[in-house]
């Protein structure tokens, strides 16, 4: 069972039931369970070792999958497959992630401007330059 605590901790906090799986020496999951309705297979792409062709095979077998490409930032997502990426493992940022999905969000999100937290860096990008003269 080789996964980041942040995954299991979040599932526990959100009261999401989960099972873990082992991996083989090629970092492929050892998982032969049939998924029930409403269950998802969380496929961790360790070190980018699983190709998109292999991901398509998992998608065909399990239908509902989420691909964790946190360690494969530069691997394109498989079309129609929910895929997560992290920024902080590859770039000098404290946090941040990207979700690729074709699902539609049925709620309105608040618009956030980052310049109040990063005025010296982003202010001139998001507003006029004159607002940030010292």
Segments (PLM) and residue ranges:
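Active-site region of PLP-dependent enzymes
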Residues: 74-134
